[in-house]
Amino acid sequence: MDIISFYRVERWLFERLIPVLPKIVQLLIFLIFNSKITADSKIGKGSYCVCKGISTVLIPGTEIGENCVLGLRFSTVRQFPYKEVPCLKNNVWVGPNVIIAGPVVIEDDVVIAGNSFVNRSVPIGAIVAGCPAKIIGWRKNLDYAIETNPKYKDGRMPFLTK
């Protein structure tokens, strides 16, 4: 079982107003995965965490859309003085060690590169990277589909040149 399976159980118990059991499941998530996902966060269908969700931290109220891929050590945090929390729309790919801070909206079909710090909203189809994150490209300009998993190629990569 992965962290999303535990979250789904926690969320189901939370929605049915069962008092103590969601906190017990949240404790299990912390002990097994070293992660924190509260029951009032919303994670859409088809979304998953790589490496079973190790070290994932979602602050209460975080919304994640459908078919999102969340990298290892993905975190969402609040940003003072705002009350709102991050919202990820559908088909967002988040790399490892990404932090999303503040009341930002990550629109559909966005790619966030690893080790990025996102503190501004990201438009549809953007590819962002850096600390703080900046737009480095657009998904529509890619000559391949990032969500597919092509077959492995034979051989080795060529050497670096100047």
Predicted regions and their residues:
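Terminal amphipathic alpha-helical/low-complexity segments used for targeting or macromolecular assembly
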Residues: 1-35, 133-162
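Short C-terminal domain-edge/linker segments immediately following a structured domain
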Residues: 78-80, 99-104, 141-142, 156-161
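Left-handed beta-helix
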Residues: 39, 44-51, 59-60, 65-66, ...
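Poly-acidic low-complexity segments
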Residues: 18, 51-52
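Short coil/loop residues immediately preceding or within conserved phosphate-binding loops
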Residues: 32, 53, 83
